[in-house]
Amino acid sequence: MAITMDDTISWIVIVVLVCFSALFSGLTLGLMGLDLNGLQIIMNGDNEEMAEMAGKIAPLRENGNLLLCTLLFGNVVVNAYLSILMAELTSGYLGLAYSSLAIVIFGEIIPQASCSRYALQIGSRAVPIVTVLMFMFYPITKPVSMVLDYALGDELGTIHSKTELAELLRIHVQQ
């Protein structure tokens, strides 16, 4: 079986789709794990570099449900197209197996492990891409996010009781 130019282009598209899957998955965990209160604390802190990164992310997080819907919608579309393309290039079941393996390892596990540790750094660099995607998907994601806003109410930041704050301080002193 000879590899054609169309096949080569398809494999390049597959690599790009896996990269976008990784981006969506990692950012979903990374950005949604940063609440507005935490970002405000970082922005008011003494580390200027971290404050700048938090300042870039905060406007996205102010529309948390829209951000969530955008990232999830993008991830689903990319992963569905990846599976279809892989199935066309291989036998159906083999394509399903390959696409599932690629999505789990390169589109989920690795990016989520990375973005959970480096959410500010990765998230702040991805703000321009996410902003474009929010604009592109807006007609679909905005109505869904409005339903979530109505059903769930305003997003609450992390609020600690006095006991929890005392324990948090104790843990920080020990580290």
Task: Place the predicted regions along the sequence by residue.
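Membrane-embedded alpha-helical segments of inner-membrane proteins
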Residues: 1-175
